[in-house]
Amino acid sequence: MSYYIPPKVWSAEESNQGKFSAINRPTAGSRFDQKLPQGDKPLQVYSLGTPNGLKVAVMLEELRELGVKEADYDLFKISIMDGDQFGSDFVAINPNSKIPSLLDKSNREAIRVFESGSILLYLADKFNHLIPVDWAQRTEVLNWLFWQMGAAPFVGGGFGHFFSYAPEKLEYPINRFTMETKRQLDLLNKELANKPYIAGEDYTIADIAIWSWYGRLAQDALYEGAYKFLALGTYQHLLDWTERIAQRPAVKRALEVDYKAIK
């Protein structure tokens, strides 16, 4: 393993940051002027087919499946590898420069919504679907929604980065984040042993959020070689839940949605 001695004061280096070295910087804010297109639909979504972007596509397609016409949307592609997330219009919607982001034009004044979990909750509350009314049941859904938001970075930014994207394979970080990823998989597998969905009997935004990461991981759709490496075939309850959700018509459509170009 390479041995690293931290400097007294850290500074960014252009080299050796791996796949995302060309876009990562230690500063926030827009980097260039770029006007985003807007369609005629009530909801404008700026996103990409990553796990976090998939959450919103699934949610909107589920609302369409339920016949919610007010949830019609225009979907635009933000290419994170090209740095579209740092354009001025996008940063005005999401100052954190991450996808997905939503602009709701159905109100007197447009409302911006960013962070995938916030978008799921916003849409669920706005249209009164996929979240329980009962206070205790709603709280359980939110428990799992926020669990996903806090847990998944260990999978994506931790395991996924060092297993798939880092410029060199390092034993310590791969082992560290594999341990945590498998702990999370075991947690989900145990929770799903005696109920069809993560918060109980009903499919909710918590399932959408978790499936977009852990279901896709269980389908071997995120990181090449991860299914075997993580022994995902041993988490049978998680696999059953993954397949149950994968068969939903809205989920199938969400995986095939067309992202319009922004330029």
Curated annotation (Swiss-Prot):
Q: What is its EC number?
A: 2.-.-.-
Would the keyword Transferase turn up in this protein's UniProt record? yes
Q: Which residues form the GST N-terminal domain?
A: 44-131
Note one Pfam family from the annotation: GST_C_2
Q: What class does this enzyme belong to in the EC scheme?
A: transferase
Keywords, sorted A to Z = Transferase
Q: Is Repeat included in the keywords of this UniProt record?
A: no
Q: Describe the family membership recorded for this protein in Swiss-Prot or TrEMBL.
A: Belongs to the GST superfamily.
Q: Which PANTHER family match?
A: DISULFIDE-BOND OXIDOREDUCTASE YGHU (PTHR44051:SF22), GLUTATHIONE S-TRANSFERASE-RELATED (PTHR44051)
Which protein is depicted?
Uncharacterized GST-like protein SMU_1296
Native source organism of the sequence:
Streptococcus mutans serotype c (strain ATCC 700610 / UA159)
